């Protein structure tokens, strides 16, 4: 894997810097590294593909070295280099695709394609000169079963979940109280509602709670907490739990009271915030507990009192909500996030070449399914294919 990264890094630098008119002295070190790559690869043969509709291709290497010059690189020099670069780039691209479409239930962190296994041989280590990639660093750690650490921006840690619970219901669905939520990606939105605006609740206060368990532990997380849930701020028709009917939700938004968010690890509270909004941080957690209250306004103008009558019908439904968004965090496991395209890269290649469903990943690389059942085998394989996708993205956008 580290050899594949170094090949890709060398080729990217060569493609960017070996251009007509460049002083040879400015790229002499790169050309020496490029020539070392050619010397190491010459005389070797590889085969890629042969799975799904990914075609089988044979690769052989017999290229001349780039020479030295006292002046600028001319057109002939650059054309010779380009022909070599293009062949190598095509080879690396196909090795990456071949690796991205394979999976294994055992030792999925190790190379699975014959071409990458061959590149892992000791003779190719002479190419290895740059392992600065975070993915490569963590792949090497995971390969030795040492602790890894990925930094993510808006990590997709929450499987998609959209539902509701009713703490009070009537057959006519005209006086309901409960909680509804939408968890997806890096965001939780939860709303508590009471059609009667807590008129019969103790002290005219309704208490709500929403608990979310993560599939992986996050550390040093920067989080945004807002006293609102905009996705639940407009009227909607909702299917009943049994699917037999529908009920109408017509929210009027109030500010939540006594808001508390707890971050827990293995059942122990690590961080707690009360009535604090904006940016917060959490040190170490695998569970988030949100609690908040809906308080019936003690003093209301006539127009507000008309919204919340003392008896049915309740045409407007008092609602309070919270939004919690994980902006950045560190995780030992690889995740899809907002700043990278690894999941899309892997999924598109597997779809384009009609790769059959294997023993590890769900059909279509469905992320909700994958993260919901994030087994050690999936974790190993996902880290490997994401690492390869990061290497491929250096050359192929």
Swiss-Prot record:
Record Pfam families: Rota_Capsid_VP6 (PF00980)
Record localization: Virion
Native source species: Rotavirus A (strain RVA/Human/United States/DS-1/1976/G2P1B[4]) (RV-A)
Q: Which Gene3D superfamilies match?
A: 2.60.120.170, Viral capsid alpha domain
Similarity annotation: Belongs to the rotavirus VP6 family.
Q: Which domain of life is it from?
A: Viruses
| Miscellaneous note of the record | The VP6 trimer contains a zinc ion located at the center of the molecule. The zinc ion is not essential for either trimerization or transcription activity of the DLP. Zinc-depleted VP6 has an increased sensitivity to proteases.
Q: Which residues form a coiled coil?
A: none
UniProt KW keywords: Calcium, Capsid protein, Intermediate capsid protein, Metal-binding, Ubl conjugation, Virion, Zinc
Gene Ontology cellular-component terms for this entry are: viral envelope; viral intermediate capsid
Regarding how it is modified after translation, the entry says: The N-terminus is blocked. Sumoylated with SUMO1 and SUMO2. Sumoylation of viral proteins seems to have a positive role on viral replication.
Q: What is this protein called?
A: Intermediate capsid protein VP6
The uppermost taxa in this organism's lineage are:
Viruses, Riboviria, Orthornavirae, Duplornaviricota, Resentoviricetes
